[in-house]
Amino acid sequence: MLTNSKYHDFEEKIVKVVNPETVGLDSNILKNIRTYLDETYVKDGKYVGTLTLVARKGEIAYLDSLGYMDRENERPMQEDAIFRIYSMTKSVTSIAIMQLLEKSKFRLDDPVHWYIPQFKDMGVFQAGVYPNFVTSKPKRHMTIKDLLTHMSGLTYNFMYRTNIDAAHRSSDVMRAENLEDFIDTLSKIPLEFSPGDKWNYSVSTDVLGYLVEKLSGQKLDEYFQEHIFEPLGMIDTGFNCPEEKKSRLASLYEHNPLGKPNLMEV
């Protein structure tokens, strides 16, 4: 049996990468990943850089960096690079709320306004523009399950489809400095539809984050750290990147109309 494992020295821990064959993978096939990414994306300038990890049976079998983490300063992609995960935070928030469900802190069918009173009188949009709306009473109250399934009637400011999307841009809802202000402003904007009627990608998970705070008695970042990140050994995950780790923080890019990455200022 092949056992020639490799050890990668990261800044805060040693990461073991086993021989792929020991976990039922093929080394030669895995090598094709680098070739494909390089020829299809990196050389063509579609991606600035990539970092790939393949794991099986609890073991890391493939770890490879390619291109740059900072194109402008020609900093090669590091194997321990830190990335902004943005909406992947939703999965962490959903885990947190389900942990609290396991502790019987709430039921999935509980109305949200039991825990967030400001949501009790939210109407459904009928006509008007921000801040003057005509609304109707929803068919039923929004539940915590609606938040988890994005069927709450809420929306996002970047959708550019409806007057409610526009209201999210015109109001200060996405510029709120804390969850309390976010919830207070959000509660004054009508719902796009009655909860449960449709699916719509939205700020529902942000509301769940506020519920985590209300139900646990902890700030969201503290809850994540104590109940998710520390137990899983996620030493590089958080809402802010500490000063001592910023050298590992990859620059952020977005695609321009030509499909090429442009540096974003954040």
PLM regions and their residue ranges:
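Short beta-to-alpha loop/turn elements within the nucleotide-binding domains of ABC transporters
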Residues: D64, D110, Q218
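Alpha-helix C-terminal capping/helix-coil junction sites
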Residues: V42, L101-E102, S187
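Extended, well-ordered alpha-helical scaffold segments
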Residues: I29, Y115, Y223-H227
